[in-house]
Amino acid sequence: MELLDILTAMAKTGRLGPVSIGTDWDEVTAALGEPWDIGTLGHDAEWPRLFAYGDLELSVCQCRRVAFVFVQTWRDTVELPPSVAGGAGVFPGLVSYADVTSALGQADCPWQPNPALTFADQCSLTVTSSGAGFTFEIPEGADPLLNIVDLPGDGHDCAG
């Protein structure tokens, strides 16, 4: 399986393997194992916390539910858990805008530009069915390169 196949399926379905917005944290760790604990996202609070499985990053709220899903794609290689990647889980990074939009089109996954996250050195698009975001860096004199893919939160607020 290729990285774009995984990201396109994630954008189309709103999930990456066992992970989706609202998934119970115990279900995630049962399926993927223990993650790297990056730390807290709050001010002087224990929750919410950011956890990582390679380049898959998950924000988890106080009630232990997945609040946000991010896949960092700006590195030379992108690492995902083998169980969600359908194999080794290591892929070439630095994916072009043209390749992403082509893959979304081939998968019949409609998208639209996201003007709120588009400015001088960055552009972004949103998949209409899931709200998944693809944000690109625009290097000077070069084509846009995929920086991050995210699944947006559902508005849940447990104060943590």
Task: Please report, for each region that a protein language model flagged, where it lies by residue.
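Short helix/turn-capping signatures at newly exposed starts of structured segments
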Residues: 1-160
